[in-house]
Design a protein with these regions (language model features):
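Terminal RNA-binding accessory module
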Residues: 1-63
Length: 63
């Protein structure tokens, strides 16, 4: 798991995501929902590579 600070809303391949960075500066996108937003910190389980240099993750918990 990674702790990710959500920094911006983006659209990738027609889907809405929040994009942020982990403490190690890894760029992570999580699907946009009403449960969290920009400036929230999430515990994220990485699922796959979404684009070069961007991982896709699933929210485990809002911290």
């Amino acid at each position: 798991t990674l702790e990710v600070l959500l920094e911006e809303e983006v659209e990738i391949d027609g889907k809405a995501y929040y994009l942020g960075h982990s403490r190690e500066y890894v760029k992570v996108a999580v699907p946009k929902t009403e449960k969290y937003g920009v400036n929230d910190i999430l515990a994220v389980k990485v699922e796959k590579t979404l684009q070069p240099h961007i991982l896709q993750g699933e929210e485990i918990q809002v911290l």
